[in-house]
């Protein structure tokens, strides 16, 4: 194995990416890279110390319509750009869901992974990584909208919008 693609739930990103770097593997990491500045600094250190090829996954930044818009802005056709505003919706909401036992077949402890131990007792069917908000098996995780598990729209869509604004 020469490289890894990391497209796990957000709270796993930093731990897996840093471990991959330390193992000498090149890394493609989906957004958001990390939850905290501290995690980001540790990731940068791991990439540099191990001479890793590292790429951030941000599909919108690579889309032709956004690349064209950036080229127009950089070309000077619009004059000197003095200000850019990017908005991506609300941040995460507090976890106030009623908790229950995780269903058979879902290794909740493994899914929680690097999160604080309190999350081991916070399962709710809404968080099931195999179910969407309507209970369909479409692997769309509502977990991303709750503090501690995801960053709400800020990290889910903000990562795209802020990258494009750059």
PLM features: what roles do these ranges have?
Residues 9-10, 14-62, 76:
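Beta-strand-loop-alpha-helix segment that lines the small-molecule cofactor/substrate pocket
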Residues 2-5:
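N-terminal Rossmann-like NAD(P) cofactor-binding module of classical short-chain dehydrogenase/reductase
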Residues 52-56, 60-166:
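Predominantly a Rossmann-like dinucleotide-binding segment in NAD(P)-dependent oxidoreductases
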